[in-house]
C-alpha cells in the first residue's frame, strides 16, 4: 500500500492525516513542456463575477496537462511509456507516451503499467493488454475497461478518476450495443463503436487519503462549507431564529429553496434514459 501517515510531534492538527507515497509509484521527471498550458483561476465565478460554484477559490497555481482522451489520432502506431507522472488536475496518475513517429502525448495511466511498456490503439481487434485501446465490440466479456466513450470518436468520458473502471457484460439482443456495469452499480448500454481502454485507472488508494487539516483543503482550492442553520434568513431558508433553531419547513431545503435530500433530480426525458438498464440502486429503468 502506498499510503503513509504524516508524523508530527509539534502539530496535533495532522494527527490522523495520511498521504500517498508518490516515490514508490511515480518517475522522477519533470512534465513535458509542449503538453502544458496555463490554467486560469476562476474561484467558482462566471463571466459576470457571480458565484456559480460554491466553496471554490484560493488554490495553488497549476498548469493543465493536455490529455489524449480520444486515442484515435495515432492508430496502429506503437507507443512506449516514458514516464508516469502526478497530475494536480485529476485524482489519477498520467503516463507520457512516445509514439514511433516522434509524437508525445499524455494518457490516463492504468494501474500496473510501467515505464518501458508499449501501448497500442486501433479501430479493429487487437490483443487485450493493459493500456490497449479499441472499440467495445472487440473486447471480451468480463474485461475491466476505463476511459469509455459515450459517442464514437467523442473521447473518453466514463471511468476516468482514480481506481474507477467498468466491466463488460456482453452484447444486447439487437447487436448494436455493448452492456457495461459501471463501478457505481449502474448497468448501461454503449454503442459498440465506442472505444475504451483496457485496465483499471491508477492510484487505487486515493479514497483512503485522510486530509487531516483545513490547510490541505485550502491548498486544493476547497473553501469551507457553512451550515444553512448558521446563516441569516436572507442567506438560506434554514437561517435565522433564536439560538439553535429547527428547519421550520416540511423538508430540508437547498440555499435556493428547492427540496433537498432524497429528491430525484434526473430529467427522465433525456435520450440516454433509454440506454440505462438498471440505475446504481438496482432499480429497473
UniProtKB/Swiss-Prot annotation:
Keyword annotations: Ribonucleoprotein, Ribosomal protein, RNA-binding, rRNA-binding
InterPro entries membership: NA-bd_OB-fold, Rib_uL2_dom2, Ribosomal_uL2, Ribosomal_uL2_bac/org-type, Ribosomal_uL2_C, Ribosomal_uL2_CS, Ribosomal_uL2_dom3, Ribosomal_uL2_RNA-bd_dom
GO cellular component: large ribosomal subunit
Segments of skewed composition (Basic residues): 256-272
GO terms, biological process: cytoplasmic translation
Region entry Disordered, spans: 215-285
GO molecular-function terms, A-Z: RNA binding; rRNA binding; structural constituent of ribosome; transferase activity
Family listed: Belongs to the universal ribosomal protein uL2 family.
Subunit structure: Part of the 50S ribosomal subunit. Forms a bridge to the 30S subunit in the 70S ribosome.
Job description of the protein: One of the primary rRNA binding proteins. Required for association of the 30S and 50S subunits to form the 70S ribosome, for tRNA binding and peptide bond formation. It has been suggested to have peptidyltransferase activity; this is somewhat controversial. Makes several contacts with the 16S rRNA in the 70S ribosome.
Protein name: Large ribosomal subunit protein uL2
Species assigned in the record: Mycoplasma genitalium (strain ATCC 33530 / DSM 19775 / NCTC 10195 / G37) (Mycoplasmoides genitalium)
Lineage: Bacteria, Bacillati, Mycoplasmatota, Mycoplasmoidales, Mycoplasmoidaceae
Amino acid at each position: 500500500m502506498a499510503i503513509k501517515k504524516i508524523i508530527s510531534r509539534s502539530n496535533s492538527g495532522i494527527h490522523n492525516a495520511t498521504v500517498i507515497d508518490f516515490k514508490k509509484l511515480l518517475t522522477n521527471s519533470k512534465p513535458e513542456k509542449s503538453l502544458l498550458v496555463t490554467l486560469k483561476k476562476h474561484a467558482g465565478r462566471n463571466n459576470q463575477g457571480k458565484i456559480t460554484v460554491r466553496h471554490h477559490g484560493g488554490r495553488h497555481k497549476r498548469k493543465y496537462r493536455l490529455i489524449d482522451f480520444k486515442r484515435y489520432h495515432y492508430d496502429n502506431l506503437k507507443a512506449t511509456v516514458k514516464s508516469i507522472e502526478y497530475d494536480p488536475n485529476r485524482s489519477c496518475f498520467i503516463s507520457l507516451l512516445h509514439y514511433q513517429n516522434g509524437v508525445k502525448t499524455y494518457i490516463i495511466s492504468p494501474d500496473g503499467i510501467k515505464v518501458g511498456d508499449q501501448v497500442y490503439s486501433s479501430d479493429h481487434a487487437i490483443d487485450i493488454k493493459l493500456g490497449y485501446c479499441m472499440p467495445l465490440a472487440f473486447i471480451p466479456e468480463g474485461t475491466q475497461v476505463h476511459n469509455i466513450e459515450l459517442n464514437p470518436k467523442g473521447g473518453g468520458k466514463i471511468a476516468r478518476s482514480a481506481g474507477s473502471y467498468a466491466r463488460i457484460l456482453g452484447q444486447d439482443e439487437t447487436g448494436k450495443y455493448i452492456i457495461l456495469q459501471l463501478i457505481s452499480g449502474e448497468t448501461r448500454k454503449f454503442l459498440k463503436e465506442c472505444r475504451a481502454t483496457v485496465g483499471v485507472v491508477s492510484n487505487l488508494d486515493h479514497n483512503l487519503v485522510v486530509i487531516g487539516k483545513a490547510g490541505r483543503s485550502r491548498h486544493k482550492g476547497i473553501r469551507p462549507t457553512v451550515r444553512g442553520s448558521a446563516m441569516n434568513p436572507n442567506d438560506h431558508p434554514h437561517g435565522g431564529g433564536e439560538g439553535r433553531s429547527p428547519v421550520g419547513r416540511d423538508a430540508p431545503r437547498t440555499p435556493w429553496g428547492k427540496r433537498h435530500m432524497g429528491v430525484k433530480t434526473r430529467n427522465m426525458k433525456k435520450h440516454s434514459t433509454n440506454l440505462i438498464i438498471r440505475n446504481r440502486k438496482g432499480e429497473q429503468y
